[in-house]
Amino acid sequence: MMNKESFGACLLLTLPEDVFAVISRFLSPSDICNLILCGKSLCALVDSEKTWLVQCEEVKVLPLIELVQWRIGISSYKALCRFLVEVVKPLLGIWVQENPELGNVVYVMPGFLSVVGCRIIPQKVAPLWIQEGQVKWSPVFEIICGFDGSKGFFLHGRDKQGSFLYPGFVMDIEKSCNVLLLEVEPRSEKSSCNEIEREVGDPFGDLDFSDRMNLLDIVTKHVSLRVDEPLTGNLFPTRSKYDEAMMLERRNMLLKMLKFGGNWKHINLEEDEQLCYNHIEIDIKKLLENLGDDIDNMEDIEDQIEVTPRKKSFRRFLRSGIKHILGKFSSSKINSPSSSETRRSNRQSFLSSGNTFCLSLKASCTLMSSYEGWPIMSADNFSLHKLPMKKPLDHDVYAGLWGGTFGWPPGKDIEDESLLLLMLTYGESEEGSERILFGTKILSYFAEHPNGSSMFVVNIDTPSLEPFPFDTDGRDFEHSYTGEGIADGYGFRYPGSKPGSLFVSSNDLLAFVWQGTEDVITLQRINLGEILKKSLGSCVSPLLPTKNFTYTKRSYSNVFAKSSTYSSSSE
């Protein structure tokens, strides 16, 4: 008599492939993989391209036309689904850092078989900036999908010689990640391909900040790869066939760089092999074993270390960095013995936890508090923090990202205005009886109030009786609410405020007006992904690699706009 498992498998096998693909919409990727346990005869059904295309659609991060476009460069829709679920979906969104004060906004979006982190630069914009897509941005990092769905990481950066890419590993990406960390990762010799085995040792985050900074500087300097066009070209595909071919060529170049390092131009990429990252590590441990107690004798052993031929300047850089990490620290005279010993112990433990060291990107979920929609973050980590985004309720009609400028009416000013990006979120009053709308500033062109300040706080349940104080410019206002707008004060916890009103126009514009003044912010909802895909904006060269990921110093100037554009840097 046929057992239940075999009977169930036979029923599934009798279904047409198209019918099973429809049924699979109600299953998760893990459910489909588990069907193999019902019988080996189901393998062909489970591996069906139609079934996994449906699963890719159900992830809901790419439209169907782009899924088909991505399939060209990957072995199967099953491999593509793996990348979408493990990498793309958890990372998409807006990531921020508290420094510099003008704002540090990194928008993570799909590229071409990749995920790209783009920094929106503090800037002044033309009156019709949103229609024309005139936004300055800069690349921060990319995660590339291999032919089998595996993943590789590139940090973007530059130095005096031009633009560089810094390859590395992608560590664990948690599904509900809210912190993105740039780290140096120990690697064991027995690790193969893109797998890393951690030995017992203190994690990178336990090291002193200066040690972490110097390790990152050493490793990025070692693994850096000079790049020119087309590697610094467009990161986002269009529907043009020519563009598609260029994107595929660029992605193949990146895969070769991950696999072969500096020799990538002279070696063919085998598509049937898994990505193996053997040329993006630095053997710090072997170096240190040869150093002994005399750090100053590094010149005698430089030739024993396999490093990229980057002249003696890099050797001097490496030597000074190692001296700082393991040398005779003058800071021990200042620090207490217990603090100094703890620091040295953590350092030694970390450096003994692997045979080689590489650059890594890690996305983890940590317990993180927030203040009026702004995450409370540490300033001494090389990290980006995801803006907490609750799924808006049906009546949370204004929640989301809005952009705009000071002034009214929009689009009529002759001079460029400072771009403001505000994240609008809902909350409750302290009494819990009224709904509050917070307009949290995440980007501006001036630092009068720090990043994370609430530009306005509006009581959604209380209509405003104030008339709109300007010419309506032919627009009708459907709603208005009472609130307060930021004024004099200091910090984002203790700002001053003045009463004001939020006006909602019939064409989806918001205008917050400070009562008794002519100050007004005009906002419209924006889609950064669509703006960047238009390729009409200006791509600004990145900063030095570690600063490009996280700018750890407080600054009131526009540090991101000091670089020239790619076109000028490649001349």
Swiss-Prot record:
InterPro entries associated with the record: At5g39450-like, F-box-like_dom_sf, F-box_dom
Superkingdom classification of source: Eukaryota
This protein's GO CC annotations: secretory vesicle
Domain F-box residue range list: 9-55
Signal peptide feature range: none
Name recorded for this polypeptide: Putative F-box protein At5g39460
Organism classification: Eukaryota, Viridiplantae, Streptophyta, Embryophyta, Tracheophyta
